[in-house]
A protein has these predicted regions:
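Cofactor-binding active-site loop characterized by glycine-rich and histidine/acidic residues
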Residues: 1-65, 83-101
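Short beta-strand segments
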Residues: 5, 19, 44-45, 71-75, ...
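Proline-centered helix-kink/hinge sites
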Residues: 23, 29, 68, 103, ...
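Conserved thiamine diphosphate
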Residues: 30-39, 90-121, 170-202
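Generic beta-sheet signal
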Residues: 39-43, 69, 129-137
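Short, contiguous strand/loop micro-motifs
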Residues: 45-46, 79-81, 169, 198
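Ligand/cofactor pocket segment of small-molecule handling proteins
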Residues: 64-65, 74-132, 141-142
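Glycine/aspartate-rich loop-and-adjacent alpha/beta segment that forms the canonical ThDP
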Residues: 125-241
Length: 241
């Protein structure tokens, strides 16, 4: 669980208190809006964190100002070890946007085409002056809250403890794994096995190349650890240091 980002590519590092990430991205959207920039923003959050006050404050500001941002709310079916029924009384998590007066809709998180079309639609809507949106994604977390939590979630191999996840629900979502199912869909649409194999080889090369690049990099100079994080350095942008 490495919390890193790449500011010049528009990716902010995740924050450990998850709702704060939505607040931060809303602030970025506000800044972009005030500057008149043609930029779209995305903030992702799980259903558990959507119960927090910070998240609601972010949505309220975005809706009031008509900011160019979309909030992606993933219903993972369980937050740490709390099921949705004990978190909210909404039937659909998309309904949370109604109170803020913003459009929302629900998609199947196992369908890559739905992801692409939904975010593209939200982007076009925001940048044409429509304001923020909320995309409710139905999916399921396949492991523990973090990997050190897997035994509590899935249960130990011995069966003791048995784990708290709903096994039938987990089996349902495992059968919807988008990697094999979307591959089958592409074959049914006319792509050939050779074309898919070539795509997969190209993707693997990209990942391997990125990994090799990172492994070859020198370790950061420890004397620079505080640069750009306090007002003493007077950094105008994140890129100065």
């Amino acid at each position: 669980d490495l919390h890193v980002g790449c500011f010049h590519r528009g990716v902010l590092p995740p924050t450990a208190p998850l709702p704060i990430a939505s607040v931060t991205m809303t602030g970025m959207a506000l800044s972009s809006w005030k500057r008149g920039e043609d930029r779209f923003h995305v903030a992702c959050i799980g259903e558990g964190s959507s119960s927090s006050g910070e998240w609601w404050e972010a949505l309220n500001l975005a809706a009031t100002r008509g900011l160019p941002i979309s909030y992606i709310l993933q219903n993972n079916q369980i937050a740490l070890d709390t099921p949705p029924v004990n978190q909210s009384n909404v039937e659909l998590w998309a309904d949370k946007a109604v109170a803020m007066g913003m459009p929302s809709w629900t998609i199947d998180g196992s369908d890559p085409a739905s992801w692409h079309s939904s975010v593209a639609c939200a982007r076009e809507f925001s940048l044409s002056g429509g304001g923020p949106t909320l995309i409710h994604v139905e999916t399921m977390r396949g492991c523990g809250h973090a990997h050190h939590h897997d035994d509590l979630y899935l249960g130990a191999p011995s069966g003791t403890p048995p784990g708290y996840v709903d096994r039938e629900l987990l089996d349902y979502w495992e059968a919807k794994d988008p990697i094999p199912t979307h591959r089958k869909l592409m074959l049914s649409l006319g792509f050939t096995e050779d074309e898919l194999t070539q795509m997969e080889a190209e993707e693997k090369d990209l990942v391997d190349s990125a990994r090799e690049h990172v492994e070859a990099m020198e370790w950061a100079d420890p004397t620079t650890v505080t640069l750009g994080i306090t007002s003493l350095h007077d950094a105008d942008t994140h890129q100065d240091h």
